[in-house]
Amino acid sequence: MLKGHLHSVESMGTVDGPGLRYILFTQGCLLRCLYCHNPDTWKINEPSREVTVDEMVNEILPYKPYFEASGGGVTVSGGEPLLQMPFLEQLFKELKANGVHTCIDTSAGCVNDTPAFNRHFDELQKHTDLILLDIKHIDNDKHIKLTGKPNTHILKFARKLSDMKQPVWIRHVLVPGISDDKEDLIKLGEFINSLDNVEKFEILPYHQLGVHKWKNLGIPYQLENVEPPDDEAVKEAYRYVNFNGKIPVTL
């Protein structure tokens, strides 16, 4: 029986998609982001909770009244959820059959052009209402330094989603001295504004809430002396990106 490998769940999330959301954090990720707040999700073979589709649907459906009242639903994050597409295909198909909004939060690090990947993603996309795409850095060399992987396949994937008319929110973590360069943010905005499917752009201010996990795993944390950006730096970044010619009115 097909099973998913989960790191954890959050029953009432409010930041990973619209409304109140049940969030599944999957195990396994190919990127090694310097600021990752879930480094304990990197290894897909680490001890994790194995679940069937039926088990998860039964856990999720009692929350449906909250989804309906808030415009929420289910978000699968990670880790990297696209490493477990066969499981997600079945899960999202069942959730949609029960009238639940579905969302994937991905950094697209595992995206590739193999027939197997494209076949599974095309099937998964049929049952996916929204994708949150994290673009870590628009500059390829800086992306490699930040995550350990290039960004060329990620940007290509963003264009594919645009061609598919798949609704997308794009998110960018703002790290002082790493991903806050003016010219890079302007280029990021030009790229985003060239896509036809982006409903929302969000800047996520860097934080250190996951540093203790790095220490518990015995992994050196290279950004320990980096302070989170202040509100003015975040506003300035929004102005540089200039998504659709405006900045969020809620700042």
From Swiss-Prot:
<dbReference type="Pfam" id="PF13353">
    <property type="entry name" value="Fer4_12"/>
</dbReference>
<feature type="binding site">
    <location>
        <position position="36"/>
    </location>
    <ligand>
        <name>[4Fe-4S] cluster</name>
    </ligand>
</feature>
<dbReference type="Pfam" id="PF04055">
    <property type="entry name" value="Radical_SAM"/>
</dbReference>
<keyword id="KW-0313">Glucose metabolism</keyword>
<dbReference type="InterPro" id="IPR001989">
    <property type="entry name" value="Radical_activat_CS"/>
</dbReference>
<keyword id="KW-0408">Iron</keyword>
<dbReference type="InterPro" id="IPR012839">
    <property type="entry name" value="Organic_radical_activase"/>
</dbReference>
<dbReference type="InterPro" id="IPR012838">
    <property type="entry name" value="PFL1_activating"/>
</dbReference>
<feature type="binding site">
    <location>
        <position position="79"/>
    </location>
    <ligand>
        <name>S-adenosyl-L-methionine</name>
    </ligand>
</feature>
<feature type="binding site">
    <location>
        <position position="33"/>
    </location>
    <ligand>
        <name>[4Fe-4S] cluster</name>
    </ligand>
</feature>
<feature type="binding site">
    <location>
        <position position="207"/>
    </location>
    <ligand>
        <name>S-adenosyl-L-methionine</name>
    </ligand>
</feature>
<protein>
    <recommendedName>
        <fullName>Pyruvate formate-lyase-activating enzyme</fullName>
        <ecNumber>1.97.1.4</ecNumber>
    </recommendedName>
</protein>
<dbReference type="GO" id="GO:0006006">
    <property type="term" value="P:glucose metabolic process"/>
</dbReference>
<feature type="binding site">
    <location>
        <position position="29"/>
    </location>
    <ligand>
        <name>[4Fe-4S] cluster</name>
    </ligand>
</feature>
<keyword id="KW-0479">Metal-binding</keyword>
<keyword id="KW-0963">Cytoplasm</keyword>
<dbReference type="GO" id="GO:0046872">
    <property type="term" value="F:metal ion binding"/>
</dbReference>
<dbReference type="InterPro" id="IPR034465">
    <property type="entry name" value="Pyruvate_for-lyase_activase"/>
</dbReference>
<dbReference type="GO" id="GO:0043365">
    <property type="term" value="F:[formate-C-acetyltransferase]-activating enzyme activity"/>
</dbReference>
<dbReference type="GO" id="GO:0005737">
    <property type="term" value="C:cytoplasm"/>
</dbReference>
<dbReference type="InterPro" id="IPR013785">
    <property type="entry name" value="Aldolase_TIM"/>
</dbReference>
<comment type="function">
    <text>Activation of pyruvate formate-lyase under anaerobic conditions by generation of an organic free radical, using S-adenosylmethionine and reduced flavodoxin as cosubstrates to produce 5'-deoxy-adenosine.</text>
</comment>
<feature type="binding site">
    <location>
        <begin position="35"/>
        <end position="37"/>
    </location>
    <ligand>
        <name>S-adenosyl-L-methionine</name>
    </ligand>
</feature>
<keyword id="KW-0004">4Fe-4S</keyword>
<dbReference type="InterPro" id="IPR034457">
    <property type="entry name" value="Organic_radical-activating"/>
</dbReference>
<comment type="similarity">
    <text>Belongs to the organic radical-activating enzymes family.</text>
</comment>
<keyword id="KW-0119">Carbohydrate metabolism</keyword>
<dbReference type="GO" id="GO:0051539">
    <property type="term" value="F:4 iron, 4 sulfur cluster binding"/>
</dbReference>
<dbReference type="InterPro" id="IPR007197">
    <property type="entry name" value="rSAM"/>
</dbReference>
<keyword id="KW-0411">Iron-sulfur</keyword>
<feature type="domain" description="Radical SAM core">
    <location>
        <begin position="15"/>
        <end position="244"/>
    </location>
</feature>
<feature type="binding site">
    <location>
        <begin position="134"/>
        <end position="136"/>
    </location>
    <ligand>
        <name>S-adenosyl-L-methionine</name>
    </ligand>
</feature>
<keyword id="KW-0560">Oxidoreductase</keyword>
<keyword id="KW-0949">S-adenosyl-L-methionine</keyword>
